[in-house]
Amino acid sequence: MITINKNFKLNSNHYNSKELVKFALKNIEINNIDLIDLSNFILEVFNQEPFILCKTSGSTGEPKVIKLEKTSLLNSVNLTKDYFNLKPGYSAISFLPMNFIAGKMMLVRAMVIGLNLQLNKPTSNPSKFINKNYFFSAMTPMQASNSINKLKYINKLILGGSKVSNSLSSNILSKIDTYYETYGMTETATHIAVKRVSKNDSISTPFKVLNGVSISTDLNNCLVISVPSITKNKIIT
């Protein structure tokens, strides 16, 4: 089961699991449309089932609803925590929708690690909401493109969901020294590989798989991903 770190904050408020469930139930009771997806996910995290249901994006086939074990979410958190050196009390900000895995995992990371998470309504243009320093944020390339002048406030910025174009990369690196491009999918509980992109690199650096992840190609030249800590089955894409 998922245990909340005592340092966890959501929008500047401390919550334990009971308080978070109460918060979610209240939002559903009053039909707070902006928080319904968040609230439903909170209730799912703390129910008695060992899994959550998550909708895939369709990158590995037809979009579908799959089961992800809660232990897999925890293992995914640990991979991210170790790679980006996330610690209790660090600040984070997210504008990702809570009905897909990337948004869900931002909350799970915050709860488990003990981050101070500023969770905002999903928007393609989050620029006006970034007005102070944050240690960690995950964005789509479009969100980053529309927030170019505010990226300096984010220490560790990860971009995923689609490829970062060369022009966008140049624009980002004109404002900050480093960002991280990620590769992953719903079936792997978000990213399993990361590429560090820095203005100081003379050549482009490749993606590197996270600890415990292995990749190969099959006879059809399809990518085969093995992440035993997240899923028992190999993923072919």
Say what each PLM segment does.
Residues 1-31, 74-96, 123-135:
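Conserved ATP-dependent adenylate/AMP-binding module captured primarily in the ANL superfamily
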Residues 51-78, 85:
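Conserved AMP-binding A3 loop
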Residues 37-55, 88-90:
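Conserved pre-ATP/AMP-binding loop-to-beta segment of ANL
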Residues 69-75, 91-146:
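AMP-binding/adenylate-forming
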Residues 56-59, 92, 107, 137, ...:
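Conserved S/T- and glycine-rich ATP-binding loop of Class I adenylate-forming
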